[in-house]
Swiss-Prot record:
Cited function: Myoactive.
Protein species of origin: Austrophasma gansbaaiense
GO MF: neuropeptide hormone activity
UniProt-listed InterPro entries: Pyrokinin_CS (IPR001484)
Domain of life: Eukaryota
The entry's keywords: Amidation, Neuropeptide, Secreted
GO biological process terms, semicolon-separated: neuropeptide signaling pathway
Localisation: Secreted
Modified residues (Leucine amide): L16
Main location per the UniProt record: secreted
Identification of the protein by name: CAPA-Pyrokinin
Family note: Belongs to the pyrokinin family.
Length: 16
């Protein structure tokens, strides 16, 4: 959970 897309919470992008 470092600002990526995990679960159903994509805050920034795929995996930043």
């Amino acid at each position: 959970s470092s600002g990526g897309g995990e679960g159903s919470g994509m805050w920034f992008g795929p995996r930043l």
